[in-house]
Amino acid sequence: MASQTAVAARGAYRQILRATRVAFQNDFRVLIAARQEARQQFDKHRREGIDTPMQINHAKEVADILRHNIVQGVRDGSDEASKWELRIHDDIERGDNDSIKIGGKNVKIEKACSA
């Protein structure tokens, strides 16, 4: 039977794979590169150590960022003046930009970005 840490690590790895599928849909070159990097990082830390829970947490945070904060764009034409089309999917985090409207005033941040 696998240890809890191994199960958590496999779960985090699966989260990264799912997040790369969502973030890099139809961009196979970047999708393959992201998955290879994830695999290399997990293989590098294959043995369980003191920092394993932190590494698992880091992997989950990476998956969350990939899923909610990465937007890809494709240029409509081949010239520099052509417009970019952004692929914004349902999981993308959308802000309201209220802090931009405040201007030069001090902005109080209620919570951390990762909260």
UniProtKB/Swiss-Prot annotation:
Top-level taxon of origin: Eukaryota
Places the protein is found: Mitochondrion matrix
Signal peptide per UniProt: none
Keywords tagged on the record: Chaperone, Mitochondrion, Transit peptide
Interval spanned by the transit peptide: 1-36
InterPro entries, sorted: Complex1_LYR_dom, Complex1_LYR_LYRM7, MZM1/LYRM7
One of the record's GO cellular component terms: mitochondrial matrix
Pfam families xref list: Complex1_LYR (PF05347)
Example of a GO MF term: protein folding chaperone
Swiss-Prot/TrEMBL GO biological process terms: mitochondrial respiratory chain complex III assembly
Oligomer status and interactors: Interacts with RIP1.
Function: Assembly factor required for Rieske Fe-S protein RIP1 incorporation into the cytochrome b-c1 (CIII) complex. Functions as a chaperone, binding to this subunit within the mitochondrial matrix and stabilizing it prior to its translocation and insertion into the late CIII dimeric intermediate within the mitochondrial inner membrane. Modulates the mitochondrial matrix zinc pool.
Family from the record: Belongs to the complex I LYR family. MZM1 subfamily.
PANTHER family: COMPLEX III ASSEMBLY FACTOR LYRM7
Record protein name field: Mitochondrial zinc maintenance protein 1, mitochondrial
Recorded name of the encoding gene: MZM1
